[in-house]
């Protein structure tokens, strides 16, 4: 992924314990972890701080997918409940109780799955804002009623609103 980089690399995947051990073995060197997303919102930063301590970790975050989607859509985040379906199960009853929700999603539980669960709970009249391929050339932002979400979407974040 970084063809010009000549140093040692460790590919990050679901192998978090191995990554932490590798970093610990290289503490005498400068180690950089590059990851997409918000590092402290269900991201690698949380695990690194817990493992090494905040004094040993310097986090330089970029803008999160949720922040970007809200900025592009003009949605304020002041009263928003933030969660993620990325790599975890979702409590759809809890999700349905909130008036404004932002989620980072994954291939296991994306907008269509979330919409189906909300419709089953009588929340089909809510709005869903789906940010697809955010900050890329093929970025698309969709405003749909929850009951109208039937397609699959690529690399996305979702905002669910009681009203538009």
Residue ranges and their predicted role:
Residues 1-58, 67, 90, 147:
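Class I S-adenosyl-L-methionine
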Residues 9-10, 74-78, 145-148:
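Short, hinge-like loop/turn segments at secondary-structure boundaries
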Residues 47, 51-52, 72, 117, ...:
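Alpha-helical structural signal in soluble globular domains
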Residues 65-97, 106:
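Short, glycine-/small-residue-rich phosphate/pyrophosphate-handling segment
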């Amino acid at each position: 992924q970084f063809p010009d980089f000549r140093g040692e690399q460790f590919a990050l995947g679901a192998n978090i314990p191995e990554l932490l051990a590798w970093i610990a073995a290289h503490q005498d060197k400068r180690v950089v972890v590059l990851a997409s997303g918000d590092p402290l919102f269900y991201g690698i930063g949380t695990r690194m701080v817990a493992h090494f301590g905040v004094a040993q970790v310097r986090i330089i975050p970029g803008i999160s997918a949720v922040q970007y989607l809200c900025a592009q859509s003009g949605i304020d985040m002041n009263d928003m409940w933030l969660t993620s379906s990325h790599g975890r199960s979702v409590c759809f009853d809890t999700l349905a109780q909130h008036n404004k929700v932002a989620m980072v999603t994954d291939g296991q539980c994306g907008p269509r799955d979330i919409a189906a669960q909300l419709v089953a709970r009588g929340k089909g009249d809510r709005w869903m804002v789906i940010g697809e391929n955010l900050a890329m050339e093929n970025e698309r932002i969709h405003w749909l009623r929850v009951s109208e979400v039937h397609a699959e979407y690529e690399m996305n974040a979702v905002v669910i609103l009681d009203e538009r």
